[in-house]
Curated annotation (Swiss-Prot):
Residues 62-73 are annotated as: Subunit association domain (SAD). Heterotrimeric transcription factor composed of three components, NF-YA, NF-YB and NF-YC. NF-YB and NF-YC must interact and dimerize for NF-YA association and DNA binding. Component of the NF-Y/HAP transcription factor complex. The NF-Y complex stimulates the transcription of various genes by recognizing and binding to a CCAAT motif in promoters. This is Nuclear transcription factor Y subunit B-8. It is found in: Nucleus. Pfam families: CBFD_NFYB_HMF. Keywords: Acetylation, Activator, DNA-binding, Nucleus, Transcription, Transcription regulation. It comes from Arabidopsis thaliana. The gene is NFYB8.
Length: 173
């Protein structure tokens, strides 16, 4: 595990080349490479019954996988931004990276989520203004019914309501 931590792909550069090999990235501390275990644990517990338990190794595995996934997608988006000579990765770049990396099945829910997030944050520079064919003049999606609870949950969901947006896994019905 220590060997993989030293080779963090968390910077500029391709995920295939091992990421940023600048001197600053060679000595990445574990707490800088991974999301906090308490946050991972809290999110995992939301999917369990009240008396459910999660083993420490399960939390650590999910922590590493989630962190690697974020680096993977971000690296692809970063490569696109570098090719386009831009310094800031935006939500549209992340959606593009997700599609490029084979996560097309998640695109529609993520587009709706990003649109709702931008509405709530008052972002007028987002894709809804840029001509999203699914966005209406008032910024509402044609899929309004299925994802209507997103507008009331805030950008990261409402832990009080315990509502979840279910995204079908590829190959399941």
């Amino acid at each position: 595990m220590a060997e993989s931590q030293a080779k963090s792909p968390g910077g500029c550069g391709s995920h295939e080349s091992g990421g940023d090999q600048s001197p600053r990235s060679l000595h990445v501390r574990e707490q800088d490479r991974f999301l906090p275990i308490a946050n991972i644990s809290r999110i995992m517990k939301r999917g369990l019954p009240a008396n459910g338990k999660i083993a420490k190794d399960a939390k650590e595995i999910v922590q590493e996988c989630v962190s690697e996934f974020i680096s993977f997608v971000t690296s692809e988006a970063s490569d696109k931004c570098q090719r386009e000579k831009r310094k800031t990765i935006n939500g549209d770049d992340l959606l593009w990276a997700m599609a490029t990396l084979g996560f097309e099945d998640y695109m529609e829910p993520l587009k709706v989520y990003l649109m709702r997030y931008r509405e709530m944050e008052g972002d007028t520079k987002g894709s809804a203004k840029g001509g999203d064919p699914n966005a209406k003049k008032d910024g509402q999606s044609s899929q309004n019914g299925q994802f209507s609870q997103l507008a009331h949950q805030g950008p990261y969901g409402n832990s009080q309501a315990q509502q979840h947006m279910m995204v079908p896994m590829p190959g399941t019905d």
